[in-house]
Amino acid sequence: MEKDFQFTFLGTSAADFSLLRSTNCQDRFDKNARRASCMMINDNIMIDCGMHAMDSLRIAKKDIAKITDIFITHFHADHFNKGFVETIAEGKANPLRLWCRQDAKIAPMNNVDVIRMEEGTYYHVEPEMNVKAVYANHEESAFPQHYVFDLNGKKVMYATDGAWVSNRAFPYLRKNNLDVLIIDATCGDYSNDRRLAEHNSIPMIRLMVPFLKTAEIIRDDTAIYLTHIAPSLHKPHDETQELVKADGFIVAYDGLTFNV
């Protein structure tokens, strides 16, 4: 019997955070009080572990003792916190595995095994899960990469931070026929912002979708989730969801789950 994988959005914000988060939403998730982007697969695998990760894990009632692996998309503070990683690793019988780009510069951490990933190569993580990393178009000094999770033949891509699809990543993505694409949507429904060199806007994603289908990176039935939402650049959640309803996009929010 094939294993089901549950994905939980622990955070869906870019690095400008709503004041609601630190006022009346300290102990709960709210669609308009997003925390730093972070994700959980089942109860043992995290994607990113940034400045709000411990709060998000607490609110989601996740037991850090069960966490075996953390995949780091890049080393900006909203995605990686060394102290939090060491807190999660503390006391484990087996070292916590931290996955990152092959050339990442990272200080040693207690009880943490750093696994440096060769671009485009699948790594076996656990039964029924293999993962490959591809280059991300984001600030190079943060060693960015995106991930494609192969789960019993079903493929989920986590693509934040980063803009467009780079020619370096393209050979490893074409014909992947993703079941789910989770994509950076930092900027709102407009096309003139300095961040568009390393983040997506909604118009950029609309432009990409036909090409992604032509390249068989996605299919007509691929679920597309927008995450890494900058509150200052977007309308409130419900308005943003209505805005992309015709596109078939799903605007992710903290606490949202889906199964693969």
What annotation goes with each model-predicted range?
Residues 2-60, 143-160:
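Conserved beta-strand hairpin/beta-sheet module of binuclear metal-dependent hydrolase folds
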Residues 4, 93-152, 249-258:
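Metallo-beta-lactamase
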Residues 7, 48, 57, 74, ...:
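Divalent metal-coordination and catalytic microenvironments
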Residues 12-13, 44, 51-52, 75, ...:
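Active-site metal-binding loops of divalent metal-dependent hydrolases
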Residues 45, 69, 154-158, 180, ...:
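Structural motif
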Residues 50-99, 177-181:
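Active-site metal-binding motif and surrounding structural segment of the metallo-beta-lactamase
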Residues 58-61, 122-127, 169-175:
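Short amphipathic alpha-helix with an adjacent loop that forms part of the alpha/beta core around
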Residues 164-257:
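Cap/insert and terminal regions of metallo-dependent hydrolase folds
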